């Protein structure tokens, strides 16, 4: 029975992996400004806006840039929304009890993927509590929580494969340009660093006491901790 179950599980995963539509380049799923503020809005490349609708308990909606074609696409409460040409990625932030008489809570703060064209049931990329999800090409970088290491820096493929810890320090991957993630130090320093998602290496960009870097074009914006966060 165990062998059969394992075989079925592999078949489901293999089928899901084969169905995934991968990106051809290092597309980024949202802007730093949005992701630092819970990512409740996201504009896809075609102009479609995905957002947590405050008029419907922050459920996931879409609309055109002119406000037309308002559509509810999921009953999930959505945060840290990202989008590419094929999928919406978001952190499900559902209340503990979502249905009358419910006594079980499953995957209420999980990392999810939803097909933009079909709007079918979301696929779980990580069932653990997640935050600050950010799409980089064919991977999602985010903060993952578990009872062993608590909150750490993680990555997972957009097909749900190869979920693993990148660093034990909970760096927030909000500012992304192509294959690079810009972040500030958390424990040993507060410098601004650049993480290369191809080589899994980091290099120093700016030494100082800084917070929440956001790269736009050739300019890095940040808060200066020693000058009243200006």
Protein language model annotation of sequence segments:
Residues 36-44, 75-85, 127-137, 168-178, ...:
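Repeated scaffold domains used in trafficking and secretory/extracellular systems
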Residues 64-68, 114-119, 156-161, 195-200:
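Short loop/turn segments that connect beta-strands within beta-propeller blades
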Residues 14-72:
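N-terminal, intrinsically disordered, polar/charged segments of Gram-positive cell-envelope systems
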Residues 70-71, 122, 163-164, 203:
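A structural motif specific to WD40 beta-propellers
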Residues 57-61, 70, 75-85, 89-103:
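Post-signal peptide N-terminal segment of secreted/secretory-pathway proteins
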Residues 57-61, 96-112, 148-155, 188-194, ...:
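Structural motif
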Residues 50-52, 89-92, 141-144, 182-184, ...:
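Residue position within the beta-strands of beta-propeller blades
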Residues 1-10:
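Hydrophobic membrane-insertion alpha-helices, especially the h-region
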